[in-house]
Amino acid sequence: MAAEGFPDNRLPTHGLGADEVLGRMEELRSDDRDWRGGRVFSLVYSAGDEVHALLERTAAAFSAENALNTMVFPSLGWMQHDIVTITAGLLGADQVAGGPADIRGYLTSGGTESLLMATKTARDWGRSKQAVGGGSGTARPNMVLATSAHAAFEKASHYFDVESRRIPVGPDYRADVDAMADAIDDDTVLVVGSAPSYPQGVVDPIPELAAMASERGVLCHVDACLGGFILPFLGKLGLLDKRWDFTVPGVTSISADLHKYGYGSKGVSVVLYRTPELARLQPFLTTNWLGGLYGSPSMAGTRPAGPIAAGWAVLHFLGEEGYVRLAEDTYRAARSLRSAIESLPGLAVRGDPDATVLAFGGDPDAGGFVVGDGPSAGGLAFAGDHTAGSPVDTFALGDALAERGGWFFDRQSPPDSLHATVQAGHAAVIGELIADLTAVAGEVAATGSRAEDRSTTYGTVD
């Protein structure tokens, strides 16, 4: 490993020179995956060298400032407001009653924090409306969501004591509206839909979910952390006809990550609310100490200014034309990959992805090795029997792609799948990936190889 030979976690007695420090950092990075070469299909979103250079310059220019107090750094307050307003416009604020003036929101450190805040706001809304507990305070609020909804909602459930009611998706991997409606009761404060869901890249039936939530008198959050900065531009291109934003009646909040398809620096996300009344429930304020007013819009107190500045810069640098171009390039690359997968014997795409995220692996209808646990995994997968086998072992395919071309895909289950978040940086190498995939799929099928490592990992605690 690259870290071998380095001192064991000790502060050096004598400081090192800048060149030595930077050299050691580069040595440590030698085992990192090659995202610059388009080999990584998760975690990183690249709009090219020019954008990356801009992000580095703007983040460095604001490396010392602290967004904890924008009275000291009003530029940060202004940039945050501008990002929120631009995002609201992209997500339909200009087309709803009340217009952009009614849509309020905040920046967070990323999608997880945005989902935490949306859940916390829903819990507090339930309390303010006396929707739970009947005044006794003993009932536990709950949220209803599909098994495909992001894992961060489980963290929110744990942090804020909101019961998570996970409902199996249908065979198409989309939220089952009727089953979710059956799970709502007097203690429900939130219904969740995804645009798209991370695991299979499908957009949930948001109009139906939102209408159902509105009819039952509960809030509806759309998790567009993944799609918020690409779906609007695919819509402009006529490549997506789904309705999922604030133009859908009943949608009460939306989250969108600027550091994903907005191509900003990690980490900056936006969470928006349909009304000022809802938005006011998110921040925390107190004077109950000796240091004066303490206020924060999200979980953190100190917030780094670099991602805010870089996010603001990339929005204005790319503009609508730039985002439309990147969206089209990304969509074409994703469609090329999907077509290649579907043309290869023994492989299949999971569901019918709507945009630029997809999951694939061994075709369960082709016969052969067992590729997934299906509904046996505690009912977490989907309605229906997906336990058939495939001549191509999905994780052996992933191993072969890594060995042949250094390609990295997240592995997920159930069902066993390789996950591909296709972004603009992949457009130049998608042909190379398809060639390698074509070669190794045949080899894995012919040899009948099966991966020993069956682990699946989305995030680590290191």
Named regions from a protein language model:
Residues 106-295, 384:
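Conserved PLP-enzyme active-site core in the AAT-like
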Residues 6-7, 63-71, 97-106, 138-140, ...:
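Glycine- and acidic
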Residues 1-101:
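N-terminal entrance/gating region of PLP-dependent enzymes' catalytic architecture
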Residues 372, 421-462:
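PLP-dependent enzyme catalytic core of the Aspartate aminotransferase-like
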Residues 236-354, 361-363, 376-379, 383-384, ...:
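Active-site C-terminal subdomain of aminotransferase-like
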Residues 346-434:
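Conserved PLP-binding catalytic core of the aspartate aminotransferase-like
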Residues 75-76, 105-112, 145-146, 351, ...:
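Active-site nucleophile and cofactor-binding loops and adjacent substrate-binding regions
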Residues 208-211, 215, 336, 396, ...:
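Alpha-helical scaffolding segments of alpha/beta enzyme cores, especially the outer helices
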